[in-house]
């Protein structure tokens, strides 16, 4: 492969998924390029969420293949997809509302000195991610006290703090007012 022929980040070939007698996906083939925003548009029940779940290892396809960065990939758990940097954000946010922004950003990625969490280094890492993507939030603020748009930012920052290579959003603007939805689209364009 030459430099001009780099592999797509994620390719799905002939992917099908059924639930009983209902075909959620039938022979779907798509390629997603790195550094791009791709949108799947369709009616309710068209299979968009199912496709996202297959990409993230939440569901396994009945037939077809996934290729990640030029190599065949089969995810039987979300953890396997996550190890490769595939992260999902659904319309139902998965935040810990009774914990701080910092706790939500750093869960599982805390900086440690021996068996102890280095709170200063953990805070510094979270601040770096917020600064890098120009999403300023008070790291001490309880997530449950934030407006929905800021909670969505925390969810995005958490994905970015996990070194995400590909982020799959499932209806990211469903819970947002129109002005908040426009702000979210600007954030996504700037990633």
Give, region by region, the residue ranges found by the protein language model.
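Glycine-rich phosphate-binding loops of nucleotide-dependent enzymes
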Residues: 2-191
């Amino acid at each position: 492969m030459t430099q001009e022929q780099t592999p797509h980040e994620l390719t799905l070939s002939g992917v099908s998924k059924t639930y009983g007698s209902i075909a959620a996906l039938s022979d779907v083939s798509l390629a997603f390029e790195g550094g791009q925003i791709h949108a799947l548009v369709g009616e309710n029940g068209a299979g968009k969420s199912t496709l996202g779940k297959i990409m993230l290892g939440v569901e396994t396809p009945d037939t077809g293949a996934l290729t990640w960065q030029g190599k065949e990939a089969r995810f039987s758990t979300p953890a396997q997809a996550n190890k490769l940097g595939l992260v999902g954000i659904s319309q139902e946010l998965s935040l810990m509302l009774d914990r701080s922004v910092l706790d939500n950003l750093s869960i599982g990625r805390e900086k440690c000195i021996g068996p102890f969490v280095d709170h200063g280094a953990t805070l510094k890492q979270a601040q770096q991610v917020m600064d890098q993507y120009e999403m300023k939030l008070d790291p001490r603020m309880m997530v449950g006290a934030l407006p929905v748009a800021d909670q969505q930012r925390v969810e995005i920052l958490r994905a970015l703090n996990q070194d995400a290579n590909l982020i799959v959003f499932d209806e990211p603007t469903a819970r947002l007012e129109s002005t908040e939805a426009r702000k979210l689209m600007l954030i996504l364009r700037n990633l």
